[in-house]
């Protein structure tokens, strides 16, 4: 980790007031902590755009496991991409609906491809990919 450097930021007073309210709402003890998180989030967003860069994330899907061979198709797709699936969690929401969470890590293009294949599978009711960083380039 590098040394900490102080720098000044000039803001419109209305913008600063809104930023301070955001800091309070999110329980930041200092503006610096909030600004660091904003910078990190922007850098992580930039990482996601690099399809070769390794990223991590979770994919959550909801589906009716009674739909004809849907569970089998989802399993086959996952086996086709086993190298980027770290682990998975399967939850029975009710008699028909299942929630599955996959923890993914790999090249951005591969993570997106797997996610789109699963989300677009006929019978999947909802899917959401939530990306983050591996943290290697952040301090």
UniProtKB/Swiss-Prot annotation:
GO terms assigned for molecular function: DNA binding; DNA-binding transcription factor activity; nickel cation binding
Positions that bind Ni(2+): 79, 90, 92, 98
SUPFAM superfamilies: ACT-like, Ribbon-helix-helix
Cofactors, names only: Ni(2+)
The keyword Chaperone appears for this protein: no
Keywords for this protein: DNA-binding, Metal-binding, Nickel, Transcription, Transcription regulation
Pfam families per the UniProt record, alphabetical: NikR_C, RHH_1
Cofactor binding description: Binds 1 nickel ion per subunit.
GO biological-process terms attached to the record: response to nickel cation
InterPro entries: Acetolactate_synth/TF_NikR_C, ACT-like_dom_sf, Arc_rbn_hlx_hlx, CopG, CopG/NikR_regulator, Ni_resp_reg_NikR, Ribbon_hlx_hlx, TF_NikR_Ni-bd_C
Family statement: Belongs to the transcriptional regulatory CopG/NikR family.
Role this protein plays: Transcriptional regulator.
PANTHER family: NICKEL-RESPONSIVE REGULATOR (PTHR34719:SF2)
Official protein name in the record: Putative nickel-responsive regulator
